Regions:
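Extreme N-terminal starter segment of soluble prokaryotic enzymes
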Residues: 4-9
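Active-site and donor-binding regions of nucleotide-sugar-utilizing enzymes
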Residues: 10-178, 308, 312, 322-330
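Short, charged/polar "capping" segments at the starts of alpha-helices
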Residues: 44-52, 128-129, 149-150, 258-260, ...
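Short acidic-hydrophobic, aromatic-tinged amphipathic segments that line or gate anion-handling sites
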Residues: 63-67, 299-305, 355-361
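A nucleotide-sugar donor-handling region in carbohydrate enzymes
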Residues: 143, 151, 156-247
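Conserved donor-binding/catalytic core segment of Leloir-type glycosyltransferases
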Residues: 243-257
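Catalytic donor nucleotide-activated moiety binding site of glycosyltransferases and closely related
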Residues: 253, 274-304
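A donor-sugar binding/catalytic signature common to diverse glycosyltransferases
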Residues: 309-353
């Protein structure tokens, strides 16, 4: 392990996490020369050559890759993750599960996290949160996605039943609960407090719009160079050659529903707009539906990058950006944001699958 005193590190699981971390550091360096480190977890996301591009950009001091381990990779850990039939037995085994899942990460942590002044973790519900709990390392949690607490109160949904007892056990460090409830979580950062279902008392608000407003033209160019691996190709696809003068509509896909239902859902959206608009599809990184094959009359942007970086591309504009449940604010490249929401999704799958927070307070 390497050791780094008196600085900070960001732990990221998605391109969006890395994007926000870069934005934060670009803003910080307007007033400070001290650089942070960044750690990219490979557990659920393929970052491709992002590490190399981050290193070239020089925004961070060091860039680490983290081979984070899910509980299912260990028979011992999973042996303590079985329903014992009553809440007392389940919570007793959960104490052991919490410790073992944290311990499972130890050989794979690439730097000494206890040496940092500030540890920032996006999506601390992943095993890294258990590691920090196991090692008693204090950290700052950051919301997984923009206003993600609006549709999924992650901590409450993952801890249905005996919530006050579980919360008390987490406060003692016996079990781990994400999103601000861990004994070792200093604070839980969100974009907008009012956009969340419920929040822990240590919540802090840092609006992403305020961060974005502090970026310089040079900062925007740095973001484009970091997050667009094939910048010229992507920009060419987005802007086109000028021969199609119809209004531009961008559809953001998501890995919703079963594959056949997803095809129907996004096919219906495309059908509504394709006649009178130049339709651009930006698939979610985890969406494996073959949009090029299914919808050949659209422009499909397959490169993996956070949607937010589109606002950093000079000269790129669309008339509408359309989302089903992805939360969108401050989308500067779009004249209009169309958010279809849960009522639209209800038409395609059982509402109980995606309406996760509505029964929590009943």
């Amino acid at each position: 392990m390497s050791k780094r005193d008196n600085t900070r590190i960001y732990i990221c699981h998605t391109y969006y996490h890395a994007y926000i971390a870069v934005v934060k550091e670009l803003v910080k360096r307007h007033t400070s020369d001290a650089k942070a480190d960044i750690m990219l977890s490979t557990m659920s996301n393929d970052f491709g050559k992002l590490k190399e591009r981050l290193e070239r950009a020089g925004v961070f001091d060091r860039v680490f890759m983290f081979d984070e381990k899910e509980d299912v990779t260990s028979e011992e850990v999973m042996s303590y993750h079985r329903d014992k039939g009553n809440i007392v037995a389940n919570l007793l085994q959960r104490i052991t599960y919490t410790k073992l899942l944290g311990k499972l990460q130890e050989p794979h942590i690439p730097t000494d996290l206890s040496a940092y002044r500030d540890v920032y973790v996006f999506c601390d519900s992943d095993p890294i949160g258990y590691y920090l709990n196991y090692k008693k390392i204090r950290y700052h949690a950051i919301e997984d996605g923009l206003n993600s607490g609006r549709l999924d109160d992650q901590a409450r949904n993952a801890n249905r039943g005996a919530w006050p007892l579980k919360r008390a056990m987490a406060a003692l460090g016996l079990i781990f609960i994400e999103s601000g409830y861990s004994r070792y979580c200093i604070d839980y950062e969100v974009n907008d407090i009012s956009a969340n279902h419920s929040l822990p008392p240590n919540v802090v608000e840092e609006p992403r719009e305020e961060l974005g407003n502090k970026l310089t033209p040079e900062d925007h160019a740095i973001l484009v160079n970091i997050f667009l691996e094939n910048k010229d190709s992507v920009v060419s696809q987005l802007i086109g050659d000028g021969s199609d003068t119809r209004p531009q509509v961008m559809i953001l896909t998501e890995p919703l529903c079963e594959m056949d239902v997803r095809k129907k859902l996004f096919g219906d959206i495309i059908d509504e707009y394709k006649e009178d608009n130049r339709v651009i599809i930006k698939p979610h990184p985890r969406d494996v539906l073959d949009y090029e094959k299914e919808f050949p009359d659209t422009i499909v942007i397959r490169d993996k990058f956070p949607m937010e970086v589109l606002g950093d591309i000079e000269g790129f504009k669309v008339d509408k950006v359309i989302s089903v449940i992805t939360q969108m604010e401050n989308v500067y490249f779009a004249k209009e944001i169309v958010y279809l929401g849960l009522d639209f999704l209800d038409k395609y799958e059982d509402p109980s699958i995606h309406r996760k927070t509505e029964n929590l307070d009943k």
